[in-house]
Amino acid sequence: MGNAATAKKGSEVESVKEFLAKAKEDFLKKWENPAPNNAGLEDFERKKTLGTGSFGRVMLVKHKATEQYYAMKILDKQKVVKLKQIEHTLNEKRILQAVNFPFLVRLEYAFKDNSNLYMVMEYVPGGEMFSHLRRIGRFSEPHARFYAAQIVLTFEYLHSLDLIYRDLKPENLLIDHQGYIQVTDFGFAKRVKGRTWTLCGTPEYLAPEIILSKGYNKAVDWWALGVLIYEMAAGYPPFFADQPIQIYEKIVSGKVRFPSHFSSDLKDLLRNLLQVDLTKRFGNLKNGVSDIKTHKWFATTDWIAIYQRKVEAPFIPKFRGSGDTSNFDDYEEEDIRVSITEKCGKEFCEF
């Protein structure tokens, strides 16, 4: 590297440091003093179900006063309690209302009633990366790299705030109108300074240390990034089997096979991310995220331009208008039932 290039790199590293320090200040203000709830169910017109889960659903809604479309996550308090997800749900709201990054979906409103908790987020009409990946089969390496770069920056941001994401997978990545990623579902995100022990995540994406019930840290997100890049570029995940237990055996074995079309740079990066030995896993070493950002596979990536959303996306989802749902699957519709008496008031008093 010439002196000028070295100086430029140095100033970029400094400006990232400054940016993250300021971001932490902004985050902590909102983390310590969460915004009060600022809407009610009657403010929204419900349009269509976009997805369902074990304790709720996500619906497309229209804000009556502004006519803006949003995605409303509706969680049944009693089901959340039954499934022991109180802590996770409170975490999700508290984190979402405090973060601010170009590739994180924004929480616009939150409120609760006798039966449910509601989180109203910006609506991302392009649908899940998952459905586009399954339709196309696999992404070219430049296409996969464009998405991977956004996740790297997002994890760099989250980790600087002591947040572990813990749920990376193509189903949780939405493609926006400009073809960029919006990370959604902070149900497993957690603020952790040291290690944590909770078993959570998706079998194919779990790091070996989670499976082995060891205390784990942010490095689990870098492992999951390796799984995601592999799945984007191959069309299938690196560890798969019919039963979770068989998947876990493959993950802890530390053996990965690569398709012949993977470039040698890609294989090298993945060997360093899908590294069972934590003392060798990229993202977890003394240089932190810079081992990933300066890796040869990312040589062509302009990190600042990605952050500024100035890079042309390899794919723009098709959709007609802001309330179009054609990129989402159809689900059976169900009425939102609200009890006349308050359920689980104590458990969710801080929501």
Swiss-Prot record:
PROSITE patterns in alphabetical order: AGC_KINASE_CTER, PROTEIN_KINASE_ATP, PROTEIN_KINASE_DOM, PROTEIN_KINASE_ST
The known PTMs are summarized as:
Asn-3 is deaminated to Asp in more than 25% of the proteins, giving rise to 2 major isoelectric variants, called CB and CA respectively (0.4 pH unit change). Deamidation proceeds via the so-called beta-aspartyl shift mechanism and yields either 'D-Asp-2' (major) or 'D-isoAsp-2' (minor), in addition to L-isomers. Deamidation occurs after the addition of myristate. The Asn-3 form reaches a significantly larger nuclear/cytoplasmic ratio than the 'Asp-2' form.
Cellular component per GO? cAMP-dependent protein kinase complex; cytosol; nucleus; plasma membrane
Activity regulation: the record says: Activated by cAMP.
Sites bearing Phosphotyrosine, chain numbering: 69, 331
Q: Where is the AGC-kinase C-terminal domain?
A: 299-351
Instruction: Please report the stretch or stretches of sequence annotated as the Protein kinase domain.
Output: 44-298
User: What InterPro entries does the database record attribute to this sequence?
Assistant: AGC-kinase_C, Kinase-like_dom_sf, Prot_kinase_dom, Protein_kinase_ATP_BS, Ser/Thr_kinase_AS, STKc_PKA
What positions are modified (Phosphoserine)? 11, 140, 322, 339
Tissue pattern of expression reads: Isoform 2 is mainly expressed in heart and brain.
Q: How does it sit in the membrane?
A: Lipid-anchor
Q: What is its main location?
A: cytoplasm
Entry-annotated residues carrying Phosphothreonine? 198
| Gene Ontology biological process terms, A to Z | negative regulation of TORC1 signaling; protein phosphorylation; signal transduction
- Does the keyword Cytoplasm feature in the UniProt annotation? yes
Mention one GO molecular function. Answer: cAMP-dependent protein kinase activity
The reply to whether Nucleotide-binding figures as a keyword in the UniProt entry is yes
Where along the chain is the active site annotated?
A: 167 (proton acceptor)
Q: Which family does it belong to?
A: Belongs to the protein kinase superfamily. AGC Ser/Thr protein kinase family. cAMP subfamily.
Q: What does this protein do?
A: Mediates cAMP-dependent signaling triggered by receptor binding to GPCRs. PKA activation regulates diverse cellular processes such as cell proliferation, the cell cycle, differentiation and regulation of microtubule dynamics, chromatin condensation and decondensation, nuclear envelope disassembly and reassembly, as well as regulation of intracellular transport mechanisms and ion flux. Regulates the abundance of compartmentalized pools of its regulatory subunits through phosphorylation of PJA2 which binds and ubiquitinates these subunits, leading to their subsequent proteolysis.
State the name under which the record lists this protein. cAMP-dependent protein kinase catalytic subunit beta
